[in-house]
Amino acid sequence: MTQKTILTTAGGVPVADNQNSRSAGPRGPLLLDDFHLVEKLAHFNREVIPERRVHAKGSAAYGTFKVTQDMSRYSSARLFDSVDKQTPVFLRFSTVGGERGSADTERDPRGFALRFYTEEGNWDVVGNNTPVFFIRDPLKFPDFIHTQKRLAQSNLKSPQAMWDFWSLSPESLHQVTILFSDRGIPDGYRFMHGFGSHTFSLINAEGQRHWVKWHYKSRQGIKNLHPSEATRLAGSDPDYAQRDLFEAIERGEFPKWRVCMQVMSEEQAASRAVNPFDVTKVWSQKEFPLIEVGEFELNRNPANYFAEVEQVALAPSNVVPGVGLSPDRMLQGRVFAYADAQRHRVGTNYQQLPVNAPLSGYSNYQRDGAMRFDGNGGARPNYEPNSYSQAPKQAPEYREPALALSGAADRYDHRTDDDYFSQAGDLFRLMNAEQKALLIGNIVGAMGSVSREVQVRQIAHFLRADPAYGAGVAAGLGVDLNRVM
């Protein structure tokens, strides 16, 4: 006979009645000494933690990464140390601008945040389903996100704000072109590629550094939603992508992605006219071809959405020995911002939660703080240096090689590199006629309510990318090209 599980309070006290509040008589007022009622309501009031400022609506799954190629030439990281080696992973997909209850089928980049639970700690590659981003200096990130959120007065989203910002930030053109193409609304999360987007680094056992860009190629192929179908699903099944991912894994249809990288030497980076750390631009795959590294599959759904998907706290600052960052400005800003956002959203000790805790364990001198539940370092000293032989000690063998720098500290104008148009134009010219028509139609539909001043300014950018691109948008909006040129 199965033993009965007794309902208790949070303090473990058995609950005799979970159907009726305690009252003064059958029709009298409730009593404050009904601690079960008070505790239940108080906890309910605090069930919701602050949602992410961006990437609030998300879906996730666990899986396994397997190395398929020898990586010793590039990295000393242990997760790469042998072919066929496997490492647990956690991948969180998301939309970017929408709130936690928004539709999965909005036109928006998709977050592609991948965690490797390695034997040397957690390694997080917090990317998107696009290889570039809208801006390249984190100083403008709050401004950009404000344009994607709701207006202060009306609490409505504003195409005027979006296009006003984009038209005054022409480095956004490449990402805008991707966003309004057929790939702007993926058919769920399984049928899209992922990217690290930024430039990262790998460091080998000899201390040699290579710059890399990460690419995740969907084994399921690419599928996108037509805008009309996306709109229909937003009303009939707003959790469409979440449902598709969860149910596919439950059926045993495990999605897979091939992990590839582009590699650039430090010498090549130093001699390039175009900044290789500019996240608004891609590297040529002809010059820097994709190199396969491995493959991962997602094969297990979370047991509890809040505990795992909502409380997971990914951060680009999580890197392991043999893996590093780069001078990419946006990456540098995110290294601080993401971990700081997690401390605000989840709490000071967010790394101790099961979904965030490294499998390798941790040893440091961090103590106390709200919701500390790991023993708090016990009786060990909470300072360093100290005389205790068993206390954690620094390990100089993990030091990264020096990074050569040049120039004085200053606020350098990143717009001295003003080629915002060639890669967006190249992308437009790669599209077939149907894809070009869809791109232009999507932009025209999105800009219809925008002021003529902003329309003219943005069309000028499209024209510089490709004359047919600008002319198509101008015709759709009824703008005389003579006003633009």
What is each model feature region?
Residues 1-485:
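Active-site-adjacent core segments of small-molecule enzymes
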